[in-house]
Amino acid sequence: SLLLGCGLPGGMMGSMMADLGGIRQTINNLRKKKGEPELSMDDMLVKLFDEVAYVWPRVGYPPLVTPFSQYTKNIALMNLLTMEQGKGRFVMMDDNMWGMILGKSGKVPGKIDEELVALAKKQGREFTDVDPHTLLKDSLDDFRKEMDENGWEYGQDDEELFELAMHPEQYRNYKSGQAKKNFLA
């Protein structure tokens, strides 16, 4: 029921527990200096779930799928640390977290909390409602050129072209024979 309350997917438990272990050590060092009792892993897990439940609506209820579930969890995790340091919430957020909040990955379904809107303005960050797909360069012609230069066939229905476009490194290794060498090594 703890996972249901905060909304995080169960598949995140492994990485979340690893992240929590490192932060727990830092938080317990801070608590020790203040003469406060250490927190168990169970205590930290409950605190994290509670903080995710606090953060999620404030960042606009992003869908809790990769990468947004990680960003939401990371904001909550950093909040636990910065609150223990006496700095408050939303102090340590990287560009990926801000990108989600600002709309650079698309519009989140809910409203961004006024505290975060004010913090973004204070930091000189700008919200956008531009469709992020319109910012991507159309690279298909570059991949066509590469295939032509290498004498590679496009394949039926351009399937080879699309394979190169979707997995360039793996495709190049396959065509050069490097993938087979790596497999047999």
Regions inferred by a protein language model and the residue ranges of each:
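Terminal or standalone catalytic/regulatory effector modules within metabolic enzymes
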Residues: 2-185
